[in-house]
Regions:
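Conserved acidic carboxylate
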Residues: 41
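Charged docking surfaces used in two-component/phosphorelay signaling
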Residues: 48-56
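Alpha4 helix (beta4-alpha4-beta5 surface) of REC/receiver domains from two-component response regulators
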Residues: 51, 95, 109, 120-135, ...
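Short hydrophobic/Thr-rich beta-strand motif most characteristic of the beta2 strand and flanking loop
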Residues: 58-65, 73
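Acidic catalytic/metal-coordinating carboxylates
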Residues: 66-69, 92-98
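Active-site beta3 strand of CheY-like receiver
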Residues: 77-83, 88
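The feature encodes the CheY-like receiver
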Residues: 89, 121, 140
Length: 157
């Protein structure tokens, strides 16, 4: 699993460590403001798992099960982060990402996007970077790896 980030990597400011079944993962002490995460994932069980885990960590989470609904939700709520699958119905993840990055609304352009997908080829990873994803993770993934990327993208969460 390879991850790339356009943004700076940040340390574990104000975080404590909590043991989990997977690995030791950082947990926020007292969030100053809950961060909003939008999950755009067509697999219900994957979306539900992510929603549950992220809510337990103090995030406000909403989910969309296709690209068109996800894009609409993003424009209406302006989340702090989007976790986006590439292979979703109605509007592929690549198009959702490109549409947000090419928007005239600066708030939409600046939303960090983590691609979380089963597409593991080097071409797909390069495409993710070219269209503006902040990170690219492949399925299957370890939740603690995803959480580490989230904390680096949203250091104040």
């Amino acid at each position: 699993m390879r991850v790339f980030l356009k943004r700076s990597w940040y340390g574990n400011r104000g975080l404590e460590m909590k043991a989990s079944a997977e690995k030791v993962i950082p947990v926020e002490k007292t969030p100053s403001k809950k961060k909003r995460i939008l999950i755009i994932e067509d697999e219900y069980s994957a979306s539900k798992f992510l929603t549950m885990r992220l809510k337990n960590l103090g995030f406000m989470v909403s989910a969309a099960f296709d690209g068109m609904t996800g894009l609409k939700e993003a424009t209406e709520t302006i989340p702090d982060l989007i976790i986006l699958d590439l292979m979703i119905p109605k509007l592929p993840g690549e198009e959702v990402c490109k549409t947000l990055r090419e928007s005239f609304d600066e708030k939409l352009v600046r939303i960090p996007i983590i691609m979380l997908t089963g597409k593991d080829s080097m071409v797909d990873k390069i495409l993710g970077k070219v269209i503006g994803a902040d990170a690219y993770l492949t399925k299957p993934y370890d939740f603690s790896d995803l959480f580490e990327v989230i904390k680096k993208i949203l250091p104040d969460a």
